[in-house]
Amino acid sequence: MTMKMMVHIYFVSLLLLLFHSYAIDIENEITEFFNKMRDTLPAKDSKWLNPACMFGGTMNDIAALGEPFSAKCPPIEDSLLSHRYKDYVVKWERLEKNRRRQVSNKRVKHGDLWIANYTSKFSNRRYLCTVTTKNGDCVQGIVRSHIRKPPSCIPKTYELGTHDKYGIDLYCGILYAKHYNNITWYKDNKEINIDDIKYSQTGKELIIHNPELEDSGRYDCYVHYDDVRIKNDIVVSRCKILTVIPSQDHRFKLILDPKINVTIGEPANITCTAVSTSLLIDDVLIEWENPSGWLIGFDFDVYSVLTSRGGITEATLYFENVTEEYIGNTYKCRGHNYYFEKTLTTTVVLE
């Protein structure tokens, strides 16, 4: 073996050793992070944890009344931990004040907690899940849920010519349960034929190809679930109101007073306004920048608030309490959309 080859092998071995050591350090830091999380749990939760198991976090999932609900055990869903657990079984238990009860098989589907008809009584319940691998390692997590009212029909506007080659995508907003059987789509109460020409379907998305004005209308998606206790499918629906509009003029006018007249010790504000040529679209975003060029958000002392309606977008810059340090400062208003960008400035002056 030549000296050059020996040196090459040495450096490769050293790199592998360093990488292995680094990976171990990362895993140890992840474990320490979750151990600290365990220490912050309230006593009513921590008392049920098995000290021989690692803690894998908590989850507070969204649920809708009268609809199916499902939740994964937190360590299985957490990107920091999921790679550790491949072949495993999951045990679910309901935590009560002075005891814990095993969740029946009818409330477990594919290892996930499954509630076919979520009612308000479930919103106060806590569930402990224990993941056990084939080699005996275990990790635990705690799941809660909170109620969110499903939205009514969600409006969506599509402008012809924006991305016609990709089509219009409509998302069926079922967020509360996994493991559905299928989704059927309707337009104006008539079932859509998924022919992969005009309409195609990918997961929860309906794609409308070759968009045209006539594609406007009401779109309903019906999600079908099954449950061993219920003879017929469980069906949940969502709807979208799609409005297809002709190609628009995206130019806009930016309006801003060049001076902010202020008084020391008092609040002040100034509004930057973008008026779109077309009142059918609100596609202008307005941002304020401080004298250093940093974007101003919703912070203390100086902050901005954005509103948009009917082709008019406004961003108001607020000063909670004007001090001498603000006098003479110049702030930049930047309005932009996909097509155009404009900027104006204003300077703080004493009245």
From Swiss-Prot:
Keywords for this protein: Disulfide bond, Early protein, Glycoprotein, Host-virus interaction, Immunoglobulin domain, Inhibition of host innate immune response by virus, Inhibition of host interferon signaling pathway by virus, Interferon antiviral system evasion, Repeat, Secreted, Signal, Viral immunoevasion
Record domain Ig-like C2-type: where: 65-147, 155-237
Location, primary (coarse class): secreted
Presence of the UniProt keyword Signal in the record: yes
Disulfide bonds: C73-C129, C172-C221, C272-C333
Residues carrying a glycan: N117, N182, N261, N269, N321
SMART domains from the UniProt entry: IG (SM00409)
One family name in Pfam for this protein: Ig_2
Residues in Ig-like V-type domain copies: 246-345
Signal peptide start-end: 1-19
CDD domains linked: Ig (cd00096)
Induction: Expressed in the early phase of the viral replicative cycle.
InterPro entries listed in its UniProt record: Ig-like_dom, Ig-like_dom_sf, Ig-like_fold, Ig_sub, IL-1_rcpt_fam, Immunoglobulin_dom
CC annotations in GO: extracellular space
Subunit structure: Interacts with host IFNA1.
Family: Belongs to the interleukin-1 receptor family.
Identification of the protein by name: Soluble interferon alpha/beta receptor OPG204
Organism: Vaccinia virus (strain Western Reserve)
Lineage: Viruses, Varidnaviria, Bamfordvirae, Nucleocytoviricota, Pokkesviricetes
